[in-house]
């Protein structure tokens, strides 16, 4: 039941965001939740890239090593130029929004809030985390969020403890990270969104351009063979053609309004055995003591030699 609570809350927040701002919300991680059991394909590609075709830089910061049963921060950085806007589904300009996915190794999960430091609480204010599914608590999602205030998203992570979970071993683990800014170009159904450049399907001459009541444009194109083709352009992209223009097949009819994109990367973290750390510290102490004793012994020998006149 406890695991269901975050999912139910996430669904509630998502539903409210769809009602309040449908244009900005439908391009985000819940599409992957609805259509894929695992957000990472066998090739290593995170499925968000199937809808967000533009590639953008995403960065991540995690500690080199962590101790068992400890809380650490995984920081996803989604850089872009401040005040960048995107087009909504009705064609209007809206602030760019961001989202992120962090795929942790088995056993790692979102840290309970009672273990968050004051610093983490401050850094995650206004951020709501959901797990990918009830069974995959090691896969965490965030978004959509206002981009200008969330170019860095902090994930508070709790490391597992091999002492209490026999399936966990000390060693190096991979973490897969994805970061997105802006809406996608393709819906899971395969349809194009209005966040695309639209091209002519065939060569011909533009014979008419009519505007619809919802901001869309209906372009009539007459081919050399006399066939008339209708191209419907949704609201948002700016037209690059006018009546009587001749176009080739594949020529752009509109600008490309997309200002976002998706990026992914892999990083690593070592689940460190504290016994090894204690052993290493003991080794350093022993070496330091040996060096000190060696210096003292050398000075003692020098004093004896000086007293004997050697």
Curated annotation (Swiss-Prot):
Known cofactor(s): heme
Record key words, sorted: Electron transport, Heme, Iron, Membrane, Metal-binding, Photosynthesis, Signal, Thylakoid, Transmembrane, Transmembrane helix, Transport
Cofactor info, note text: Binds 1 heme group covalently.
A cellular component term, taken from the record's GO annotations: plasma membrane-derived thylakoid membrane
Role: Component of the cytochrome b6-f complex, which mediates electron transfer between photosystem II (PSII) and photosystem I (PSI), cyclic electron flow around PSI, and state transitions.
Keyword match Acetylation: no
Subcellular location: Cellular thylakoid membrane
Protein name per its UniProtKB record: Cytochrome f
PROSITE patterns for the chain: CYTF
Family statement: Belongs to the cytochrome f family.
UniProt membrane topology term: Single-pass membrane protein
Species whose genome carries this gene: Prochlorococcus marinus (strain MIT 9313)
A GO MF term: electron transfer activity
InterPro entries (alphabetical): Cyt-f_TM, Cyt_f, Cyt_f_lg_dom, Cyt_f_lg_dom_sf, Rudment_hybrid_motif
Segments crossing the lipid bilayer: 277-297
Stored SUPFAM superfamilies: Cytochrome f subunit of the cytochrome b6f complex, transmembrane anchor (SSF103431), Cytochrome f, large domain (SSF49441), Rudiment single hybrid motif (SSF51246)
GO terms classed as biological process: photosynthesis
Coiled coil stretches, renumbered: none
Record has Transmembrane as a keyword: yes
Binding residues annotated for heme, in chain numbering: 28, 48, 51-52
Lineage: Bacteria, Bacillati, Cyanobacteriota, Cyanophyceae, Synechococcales
Residues in the signal sequence: 1-23
Subunit structure comment from the entry: The 4 large subunits of the cytochrome b6-f complex are cytochrome b6, subunit IV (17 kDa polypeptide, PetD), cytochrome f and the Rieske protein, while the 4 small subunits are PetG, PetL, PetM and PetN. The complex functions as a dimer.
């Amino acid at each position: 039941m406890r695991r269901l609570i975050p999912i139910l809350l996430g669904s509630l927040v998502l539903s409210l965001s769809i009602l309040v701002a449908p244009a900005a919300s439908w391009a985000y991680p819940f599409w992957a939740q609805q259509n894929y059991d695992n957000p990472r394909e066998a090739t290593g590609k995170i499925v968000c890239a199937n809808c967000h075709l533009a590639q953008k830089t995403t960065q991540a910061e995690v500690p080199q090593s962590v101790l068992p049963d400890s809380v650490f921060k995984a920081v996803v950085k989604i850089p872009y130029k401040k005040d960048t806007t995107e087009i909504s589904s009705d064609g209007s300009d809206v602030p760019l929004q961001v989202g992120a996915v962090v795929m942790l190794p088995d056993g790692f999960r979102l840290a309970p809030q009672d273990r968050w430091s004051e610093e983490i609480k401050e850094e995650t204010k206004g951020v709501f985390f959901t797990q990918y599914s009830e069974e995959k608590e090691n896969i965490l999602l965030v978004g959509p969020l206002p981009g200008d205030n969330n170019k860095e998203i902090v994930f508070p992570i709790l490391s597992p403890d091999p002492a209490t979970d026999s399936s966990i071993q000390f060693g190096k683990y991979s973490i897969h990270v994805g970061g997105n800014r802006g809406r996608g170009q393709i819906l899971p159904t395969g349809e194009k969104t209005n966040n695309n450049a639209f091209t002519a399907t065939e060569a011909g001459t533009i014979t008419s351009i009519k505007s619809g009541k919802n901001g869309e444009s209906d372009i009539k194109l007459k081919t050399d063979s006399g066939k008339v083709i209708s191209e419907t352009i949704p609201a948002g992209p700016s037209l690059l053609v006018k009546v009587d223009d001749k176009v080739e097949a594949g020529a752009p009819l509109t600008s490309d309004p997309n200002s976002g994109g998706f990026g992914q990367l892999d990083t690593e973290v070592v689940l460190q055995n504290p016994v090894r750390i204690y052993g290493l510290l003991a080794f350093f102490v022993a070496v330091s003591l040996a060096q000190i004793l060696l210096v003292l012994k050398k000075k003692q020998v020098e004093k004896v030699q000086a007293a004997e006149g050697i």
